[in-house]
Amino acid sequence: MPLRLPDGLPAIDILKRENINIEDMLAKEDDKRPLRIVILNLMPFKATTETDFIRILSNSPLLLDVNFMKLKSHASKHTPAEHMDRFYHTLEELSKENIDGMIVTGAPVEGMAFEEVDYWTELQEIFNWARENVRSTLYICWAAQAGLYHFYDIPKYPLPKKMFGIFPTIPLKPEQPLFRGFDDVFPMPQSRHTEVRREDIERVDDLEIIAESEESGVAIVRSRSRREFFITGHLEYAPDTLDTEYRRDLGKRDDVEVPKYYYREDNPDKGPLVTWRSHANLLFMNWVSWVLGSE
């Protein structure tokens, strides 16, 4: 099904090199009213994250109009201002439209208290706006922790070592529309230094843990009263993302552990074994079809 994307977005050419011809999927002006999705991209390297989400949303069975949101109170240090001005919009600009779905990405600030993040106040305003005006929101990784803290006062805790790898995860509520077509176990990429804990979430009546891993802990939490999902991992990750992180960290110090269940035979020289892509596509398409696309 077609996508509507900003003209000239670099992700279009990147995906073309992966034999995903986004140009063939681009919507025409006379197409019917699309589902409008806004991605609040908090990651430093914007184009990489844009590509990850467009890659996965390109499988949508429904027409999607995808736009990107930026913060007013924080300037990106790793993405040119020209890129941000051309392809990103503020909350004030996007709030004039009817938004069906929102995705809030992770951010490399998990070592800080939420209140110490320089854009925390603005982020809270966006969270509140999304809750009142958007049909469904996906909060990813740090954003999941931030959303749980903002709405429900759920704390995050430092981990003794980085949760890093592809972890077997169990859908505890397989009847949830998000899990249509899922197996009894699915793999979820994780890359984080902090966690939220089951006991804190279970104290909140409005929250329900719908997926969990024996090794990596809480995986997906949903709001019972709203179409909000808090995902602690990164199903949107490209095949080489954890490899890039591993080699980046290895260049800084020697005590970096190999990401678990990621490389063939646990050997970085043999490359990653991609096991999560089909469930990642399924989860996002279920979100589009059954959560956004249904009244």
Residue ranges and their predicted role:
Residues 101:
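Short, Asp-centered acidic motifs that coordinate Mg2+ and/or phosphate
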Residues 72-85:
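N-terminal beta-loop-helix "entrance" segment that forms/cooperates
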Residues 1-73, 89-94, 98, 125, ...:
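Amide-donor transfer/coupling interface in amidating biosynthetic enzymes
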